[in-house]
């Protein structure tokens, strides 16, 4: 069911004013449409200042929220850290507080992690591990963690609003007893589910960008090639398997490090095994890696999702992750 949600409600999901404003003007949205819209706004529309505003709305991990913070936001933060508070001690909280100070001094913003279901030890380990990152890499990771938090809060928001609507309808509408009425209601639910499952895309389902972490800047002019595996069996780790890689599309990164379209704009992505390759030698002749290839799978249940597969490149190392 598509819902109209106000700016204040969106700001409980994410502390960025610009994010909340853009989400409120994008509705009405179904829960699935809201996820795709939120990801697009967060990663492609708002700027770094908006990211930092969202980060600053959170209490530091291990701390209770300040009374000055929005009460609904504060209650969510306490709930999300409940597992951590239940698995810690005074001395452990002190160690976490000390690492929080070190982290903020290095990066300029507080440590952001999707705390829901995580123990104190897990979060402290993640903090220590991420402390070693370069600032520009850590900023991206923090933005991704914020999106995870936002999506969890959005799911709760839609669930709560749907419950209110359901209770209102059941108290104000007569009970339908005719078989044809029951069929009409069931059909309506099925149609809503189908609509929610197939949101209209605003960009191709597979995208990428390249970040040169040695310079702390986007890598422009990197040739990118996307392929899909064609064969009766999947590709083998050693021998390649019974099939071939078929070209889907080629592009190059722009000054922001983002590639052009690598495939057509389709709503449903064909399930299968994909390979995205980067001509790193042409971009950086002294690079240890002449090219980088990343292989990933898309299942039937994921065909409506977006796959952002970036490359974080340095002369002697690289990393990747699945973004949104």
UniProtKB/Swiss-Prot annotation:
SUPFAM superfamilies for the chain: Transthyretin (synonym: prealbumin), UraD-Like
GO cellular-component term (any): peroxisome
Catalytic reaction equation(s): 5-hydroxyisourate + H2O = 5-hydroxy-2-oxo-4-ureido-2,5-dihydro-1H-imidazole-5-carboxylate + H(+); 5-hydroxy-2-oxo-4-ureido-2,5-dihydro-1H-imidazole-5-carboxylate + H(+) = (S)-allantoin + CO2
Keywords on record: Acetylation, Cell membrane, Cytoplasm, Decarboxylase, Hydrolase, Lyase, Membrane, Multifunctional enzyme, Peroxisome, Phosphoprotein, Purine metabolism
Annotated spans, OHCU decarboxylase: 2-161
Localization per record: Cell membrane; Peroxisome
Pathway per the UniProt entry: Purine metabolism; urate degradation; (S)-allantoin from urate: step 2/3; Purine metabolism; urate degradation; (S)-allantoin from urate: step 3/3
Primary location group: membrane
Stretches the record annotates as Required for BRI1-binding: 2-29
Tissue expression summary: Expressed ubiquitously with highest levels in flowers buds and elongating inflorescences.
GO aspect biological process, one term: response to brassinosteroid
PROSITE patterns according to UniProt: TRANSTHYRETIN_1, TRANSTHYRETIN_2
Enzyme active site: 58 (proton donor)
Induction of its expression: Not regulated by plant steroids.
GO MF annotation terms: 2-oxo-4-hydroxy-4-carboxy-5-ureidoimidazoline decarboxylase activity; hydroxyisourate hydrolase activity; identical protein binding
Family named by the database record: In the N-terminal section; belongs to the OHCU decarboxylase family.
Function: Involved in the last two steps of the degradation of uric acid, i.e. the hydrolysis of 5-hydroxyisourate (HIU) to 2-oxo-4-hydroxy-4-carboxy-5-ureidoimidazoline (OHCU) and its stereoselective decarboxylation to (S)-allantoin, a major ureide compound. Might function as a negative regulator to modulate brassinosteroid-mediated plant growth. Together with B1L, prevents plant growth and development, but by opposition to B1L, negatively regulates cold tolerance, probably in a brassinosteroid (BR) and allantoin-dependent manner.
Name listed for the protein in its UniProt record: Uric acid degradation bifunctional protein TTL
Gene: TTL
